[in-house]
Amino acid sequence: MERWWFNSMLFKKEFERRCGLNKSMGSLGPIENTSEDPNRKVKNIHSCSNVDYLFGVKDIRNFISDDTFLVSDRNGDSYSIYFDIENQIFEIDNDHSFLSELESSFYSYRNSSYLNNGFRGEDPYYNSYMYDTQYSWNNHINSCIDNYLQSQICIDTSIISGSENYGDSYIYRTICGGESRNSSENEGSSKRTRTKGSDLTIRESSNDLEVTQKYRHLWVQCENCYGLNYKKFLKSKMNICEQCGYHLKMSSSDRIELLIDAGTWDPMDEDMVSLDPIEFHSEEEPYKDRIDSYQRKTGLTEAVQTGIGQLNGIPVAIGVMDFQFMGGSMGSVVGEKITRLIEHAANQILPLIIVCASGGARMQEGSLSLMQMAKISSALYDYQLNKKLFYVSILTSPTTGGVTASFGMLGDIIIAEPNAYIAFAGKRVIEQTLNKTVPEGSQAAEYLFQKGLFDQIVPRNLLKSVLSELFKLHAFFPLNQKSSKIK
């Protein structure tokens, strides 16, 4: 049996006539005739393979809230199961052998070493994939519900036991699992399950919110695979996800540390700060107050850092935009700092690097922010055409708006990071303006590279060496090599 056959064993009651149980495989599939008698037993419904299921075991927590589910075994016997998470109720509609098996599984679960010693096996969300055809469907549905109940119980002991699989850890579920349960008792809370004639109560070991807040700062969640990356190690891995290799956002300081040799960074224009040229006041927060809050949050004065440094011994002028500061938006100060950097590089005959990460022009400064596009482009014209110097533009995710329309696309060499989101107008803006759906991936670096918009897509771990080779190719050499050549 293929593993995905057991990807889903539960389905909502309103889908009862649309989905059935494969008689030979014990699997769910859509029925071919949707007009048949709704009273017909599920065991007579014909099913087919290669289908997309409603949801799998790992998705149960997202679907079960206050709903009735219809489950059935391969004999066609149906059972209505009711879950009410808010009131912590679990009910089955009739007293059958299935009920007794399920009830026994609850008791065995409650008395198991799981609550006392912590979970030491594989991830329960993926145990269903290891089932084979010899397992009965009843056992599987028991396991599905059992796994779901396990996922709802605070598992502090899994932290202590040092589980290596993030999927079975309570930290993972509290950070990635979405909505947290409302619980005001610090000393713990209880979960009650009710069947006909019996009540089961399982104690939770601690308050979920407390644990969530306690460990949230230790982890960074991947935007692509939603896996957790230990923040302490993420910087040494260049903010690349350990699970899927996705390039996460980096601060400007981290990028400078990545590209510039240690001890060679000399920042420029650090004391330049934004004012409020058009006295922009929003209902939520005045512009100047917003600037102050971002300065405190990021430790930066503006959305770009500029300066001089050495890249593998080669002197370079570099500007690095920071998306954490008001989305990397380009205001008058950002434009002025980049313009001064370009002019300084032209006077000192230095190669130029600008790392772009921006949402575009800053609306709080009106047309002044738009004029920065023309000012920077004019400075680049003199730098590239009159001074005949070398400019490398590095596009990271996201690069949009006025930055894309100006200096982002003016590089002699344009480099993009893998999976970077690069566009002029964002997907949402296009769809709302034109009432047309933007194809998925049409604004990703890989797709745009095929259309000729970039020269290279370079991963972070290779970026510094690639830049070094490019500079040497354009006759910019390390300082020690320059002095030896002069001699």
Curated annotation (Swiss-Prot):
Reactions accelerated catalytically: N(6)-carboxybiotinyl-L-lysyl-[protein] + acetyl-CoA = N(6)-biotinyl-L-lysyl-[protein] + malonyl-CoA
Function statement: Component of the acetyl coenzyme A carboxylase (ACC) complex. Biotin carboxylase (BC) catalyzes the carboxylation of biotin on its carrier protein (BCCP) and then the CO(2) group is transferred by the transcarboxylase to acetyl-CoA to form malonyl-CoA.
Coarse class of the protein's main subcellular location: plastid
Matching PANTHER family: ACETYL-COENZYME A CARBOXYLASE CARBOXYL TRANSFERASE SUBUNIT BETA, CHLOROPLASTIC
EC number annotated for this UniProt entry: 2.1.3.15
Protein's UniProt name: Acetyl-coenzyme A carboxylase carboxyl transferase subunit beta, chloroplastic
Listed GO CC annotations: acetyl-CoA carboxylase complex; chloroplast stroma
Organism: Atropa belladonna (Belladonna)
